[in-house]
């Protein structure tokens, strides 16, 4: 099956199916949200141009959709953003502007520009059409693996996980959806646990998880549908990167490797069960890969 590759953990686990967001076919996983949103924008909104803040993945989605529909796109990224992701956004025609030292600082700048210039701001979380678009890949998971027991998803802002939850719980409510976030950027986890929006420092090296503020719409969906939510360490994420490369020959970035790190936390609970890991991207810099291979 081109959607999944079977793999066993510790020789004791059930079949694992890493759904790849870094292969040519599955790369569209991270693009669907932006495409669905821009496709349904009015002509007036498109004429204004779009602006977004991103550490890379959301920005690529917006840039791709903007190019597809001939819309001007401005993407605010923090200084130190993944060079590969920045280059990808620029190659897609987006105007990339470096602002601030974190995603949230870049986001605040983008929101200010929206007020000043009238752009259509595309929020990375509080966009129903974005969440709906991202969630479509869960349809493919359920079609390809009708007997799946659980799906592990990475969570930064939570839009991807919210999309998966929405689809899975509507069609196959018995399937568990487990969210995984870095303990070095726990805003979404803390918000889910405390049932209120909270902020927390985002110090993770996994830029796809580096969100310091939770968002209202994804949190509302996650509180209703997410079966579990765990935090993993930076070391566990790096270890998962190496495992995926060594055993699956998949190059996963930190956010993409987080689901495996989460499963290893809970492996005794999932022995003998069919589990899907959403590998949400393979945009790993050479320095990040070197650090993972060095174990530091």
Predicted regions and their residues:
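PLP-dependent amino-acid enzyme catalytic core
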Residues: 1-296
């Amino acid at each position: 099956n081109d959607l999944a590759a079977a793999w066993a953990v510790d020789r004791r686990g059930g079949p694992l199916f890493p759904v790849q967001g870094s292969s040519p076919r599955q790369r569209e996983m991270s693009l669907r949200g932006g495409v669905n949103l821009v496709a349904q924008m009015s002509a007036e909104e498109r004429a204004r141009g779009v602006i977004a803040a991103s550490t890379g993945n959301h920005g690529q989605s917006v840039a791709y959709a903007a190019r597809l529909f001939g819309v001007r796109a401005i993407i605010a990224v923090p200084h130190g953003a993944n060079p590969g992701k920045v280059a990808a956004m620029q190659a897609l025609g987006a105007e990339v502007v470096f602002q601030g030292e974190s995603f949230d600082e870049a986001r605040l700048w983008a929101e200010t520009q929206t007020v000043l210039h009238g752009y259509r701001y595309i929020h990375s979380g509080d966009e129903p059409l974005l969440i709906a678009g991202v969630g479509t890949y869960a349809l493919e998971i359920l079609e390809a693996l009708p007997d799946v027991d659980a799906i592990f998803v990475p969570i930064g802002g939570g839009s991807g996980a919210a999309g998966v939850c929405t689809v899975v719980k509507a069609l196959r409510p018995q399937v568990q959806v487990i969210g995984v976030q870095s303990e070095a950027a726990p805003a979404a986890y803390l918000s889910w646990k405390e049932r209120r929006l909270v902020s927390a420092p985002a110090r993770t090296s996994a830029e796809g998880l580096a969100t310091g503020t939770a968002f209202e719409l994804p949190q509302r969906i996650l509180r209703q549908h997410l079966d579990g939510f765990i935090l993993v360490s930076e070391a566990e994420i790096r270890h998962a990167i190496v495992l995926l490369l060594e055993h699956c020959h998949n190059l996963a970035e930190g956010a993409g490797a987080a689901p495996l790190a989460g499963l290893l936390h809970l492996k005794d609970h999932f022995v003998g069960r069919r589990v899907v890991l959403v590998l949400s991207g393979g945009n790993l810099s050479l320095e990040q890969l070197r650090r993972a291979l060095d174990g530091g």
